[in-house]
Curated annotation (Swiss-Prot):
GO CC aspect terms: actin cortical patch; actin cytoskeleton; mating projection tip; medial cortex; Rvs161p-Rvs167p complex
Lineage, opening ranks: Eukaryota, Fungi, Dikarya, Ascomycota, Saccharomycotina
Species this chain originates from: Candida albicans (strain SC5314 / ATCC MYA-2876)
Extent of Acidic residues compositional bias: 107-118
Signal peptide span: none
Chain positions covered by the region annotation Disordered: 105-127
PANTHER family: BRIDGING INTEGRATOR 3 (PTHR47174:SF3)
Disruption phenotype: Does not display the endocytic, hyphal growth, virulence, or cell wall defects exhibited by disruption in related RVS161 or RVS167.
Alphabetized Gene3D superfamilies for the sequence: Arfaptin homology (AH) domain/BAR domain (1.20.1270.60)
Family annotation (SUPFAM superfamilies): BAR/IMD domain-like
Residues forming coiled coils: 30-56, 222-259
Job description of the protein: Component of a cytoskeletal structure that is required for membrane curvature.
Designated name of the protein: RVS161-like protein RVS162
Length: 335
């Protein structure tokens, strides 16, 4: 900062103190204050919106990662063994993951093993699920393995297909809009400085008019009255010129803001409308893809489980399993 800039900053700081203490009359423009208040509200809301939109994308990543973690834990918990429940799934279906449609072909073979355990015969059914994609074929022994693979592929496809349009149509436009605040705030700051200069100059001129002798140098007080009057008139002329100059600068920037701030505020609706529409469509696409894929897996659950769920009997089935577990010797001490 140059010496002139430092001097101006010091003078403006002194003017601010005198304004706060009431020693200088402050210029008030209620129309401008109203428009600046509207502008500050818009600035606060749009910056908050940008932050929340970034957090929304992060939350979707967190959601899909949590789904993968749960699916991975379920896959480890179930292991590779089949049970009767996983063998009763529907045999055909299709999974749509975004742009790819995966066709599911299932081949089942039944292996019956008869074992005599207290004259009881046990029948075990083995199910193999084959998912064919464009280049790769995956074989799964149960629905949990298929669920884990499907969720993982959902994460890879949905988030990858979502990020680019979300950034281009939602995040980037609002970031570009918010970037203008830096320039606008600089103009508002400049207007504030010009107002301080204007108020300080008005106060200086007022003091000269009210107390002309205090603005005459001591050496001139011994001179004749005409010279004192001439000096006063000369100083008054200089102060008036300076006041006109600072007033012109202040009025110019003040009028500019009075015209352009309302326009900027009114343009926000038409500017954000396309991004809002895109945001809704991206949400719809993301959740529709997730729903479609998970619904295909849900259709593979055995019919009895679905019926029990509809009738509210699923909890009774769980209680029945718990009762059977309690009959085991290893869990007999848990009562």
């Amino acid at each position: 900062m140059s010496w002139i800039g430092i001097k101006k900053a010091i003078n403006r700081a002194g003017t601010q103190v005198m304004l706060k203490t009431g020693h200088i009359e402050q210029t008030i423009d209620k129309e401008y204050e109203f428009q600046e208040k509207r502008y500050r509200t818009m600035e606060e809301n749009s910056i908050k919106l940008q932050k929340n939109l970034r957090l929304y994308l992060d939350s979707l990543r967190l959601l899909t990662n949590s789904q993968i973690n749960i699916a991975e834990s379920l896959n480890s918990f179930y292991g590779t063994n089949n049970d009767k429940r996983s063998s009763n799934i529907s045999r055909t279906g299709s999974v749509n993951t975004g742009d790819k449609i995966q066709t599911i072909h299932e081949e089942e073979g039944e292996e019956k093993e008869e074992e005599e355990n207290d004259n009881t015969t046990t029948t075990t059914t083995t199910t193999t699920t084959t998912i064919t994609t464009t280049n790769t074929t995956y074989n799964y022994n149960n629905l949990i393995q298929e669920y884990y693979a499907t969720i993982k592929q959902l994460n890879d496809s949905c988030i990858a297909n979502l990020e680019n349009p979300y950034n281009q149509t939602v995040l980037n436009p609002i970031a570009r809009f918010n970037s203008y605040y830096i320039e606008i705030n600089e103009i508002i700051k400049k207007r504030h400085n010009k107002l301080l200069d204007y108020d300080a100059m008005k106060n200086k001129l007022r003091k000269l008019i009210e107390n002309p002798t205090t603005n005459i140098s001591p050496s001139m007080k011994t001179n004749i009255i005409e010279l004192n009057h001439n000096q006063y008139e000369e100083k008054l002329k200089i102060y008036n010129q300076e006041l006109t100059e600072v007033e012109s600068k202040y009025v110019e920037i003040n009028n500019q803001l009075l015209i352009e701030l309302p326009k900027l505020i009114n343009h926000r609706i038409s500017y954000f409308d396309p991004s809002f529409e895109s945001f809704v469509k991206i949400q719809l696409r993301f959740f529709n893809e997730n729903y479609h894929v998970l619904n295909q897996l849900q259709l593979k659950l055995d019919a009895q489980t679905r019926q029990d769920y509809i009738e509210g009997k699923l909890e009774d089935r769980i209680d029945d399993v718990l009762r059977k577990m309690k009959k085991l010797d290893i869990t007999s001490g848990l009562d």
